[in-house]
Amino acid sequence: ALDNQRCLIGGDIQTYDKDEVGYARTGAFTDLSQRDDFTNCGALFIGDVVGDDLSLYPDTRELTGMLNSPARFLPGNHDLDFDADAEHKFDTYRQEFGPAYHSYDVGNAHIISLESVEYPVDGEQYNGAIDDDQMAWLRADIERTPEDKVIVLASHIPLFSFSDSGSGRHQ
């Protein structure tokens, strides 16, 4: 493992239509495709893969084929199945990308990707939270992680925010 490994972590690709997929292709992804400094670690995109139109998943995921590394994902609030209940809120996401939360080892790092979107809350709203099942999984995952690994926690909605500390949202 490298002492100076570099990982690409990006958020909010958030394409709303095929034109925006094209802008992402000719912009950020073309720029990233010319870099190789993160190839030993890969890329992690931390939510809002698309901007509510889940039919754009294949087009947006195809962009990551331009990278010189593997790409992994976690969901954000714009990746929701808005017509689903809480249990099925990320069914389409899971069909396209796999589990909504997961972990993996790369070099000196153990990277934990969390699903931090609670939906629905009060009708059609969302909140930032981690449910009890995921918290139990997280504890077990950390317990299994060798002590010499650097642990990186990634989530779409921040796990703690000073700006929302007095409210019930994003807690």
Briefly describe each language-model feature range.
Residues F160-F162:
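Sequence/structural signature of outer-membrane beta-barrel proteins
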Residues N4-D17, N108-P120, V152-H156:
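Active-site-proximal beta-strand elements of phosphoester/diester hydrolases
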Residues A1-P58:
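N-terminal active-site segment of His-dependent metallophosphoesterases
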Residues I9-G11, G42-D48, A71-N77, V152-H156, ...:
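Active-site neighborhood of phospho(di)ester-bond hydrolases with catalytic His/Asp-centered motifs
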Residues L54-V150, G166-Q171:
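Extended active-site neighborhood of metal-dependent phosphoesterases/phosphodiesterases
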Residues Q14, V49-V50, H78-D79, V117, ...:
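Catalytic metal-binding/acid-base residues of hydrolase active sites
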